Every structure is written in C-alpha cells, then in structure tokens.
C-alpha cells in the first residue's frame, strides 16, 4: 500500500548542535528532492509551505474534517495553537 520508507529519528539533548543537525538533514533532503515529513511534537523547522509540500491535499482534508468535528468556532479555538495556525492547520 505504501512505498518503502525510512525513519530518521534525532532524539537527544535540546542544544544548538542538535538544532543545527536537524536543519542540515532537512536541508540535504530538500536539495536531493527527497520527500519527507517531520514529527509534529519534536524540534522541527516546519512552515506552512513545507506542510503543504509534504502533505498536499491532505491538508485540505484535515481542515475539512476539523471543521466537521469542531463545527463551533470557539471549540476550534480551544483545540488550536499558534503552531497549528502558522502551519495552516486551523484554516
């Protein structure tokens, strides 16, 4: 059902060196044209554009289902965050 994948996990100390490594790895993936996604709850360099590139139309489906499940704007706000807003996942 899915193409072969690989998980590249960088856990460890929250330091400048770790952040530089994560940025370097994602930069190299971008340069090589390798598709990838990143764990939401970990250190990442996600942007609205990166999320759209990684997930494509699934972003629209996410927002549609989010509106279906949380049809009240106050509920959507309760289950929101600046991260979701900035990534276009609370549209």
Locate each region found by the language model.
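C-terminal substrate-recognition/cap domain of FAD-linked oxidoreductases
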Residues: 1-20
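Activity-critical C-terminal alpha-helical subdomain
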Residues: 16-23, 27-91
């Amino acid at each position: 059902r899915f193409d072969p994948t690989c998980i590249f996990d960088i856990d460890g100390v929250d330091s400048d060196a770790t952040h530089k490594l994560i940025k370097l790895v994602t930069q190299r993936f971008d340069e090589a044209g390798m598709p990838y996604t990143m764990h939401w709850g970990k250190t990442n360099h996600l942007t609205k554009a990166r999320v759209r590139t990684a997930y494509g139309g699934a972003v629209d489906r996410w927002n549609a289902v989010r509106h279906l499940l949380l049809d009240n704007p106050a509920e959507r706000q309760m289950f929101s965050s600046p991260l979701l807003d900035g990534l276009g996942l609370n549209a």
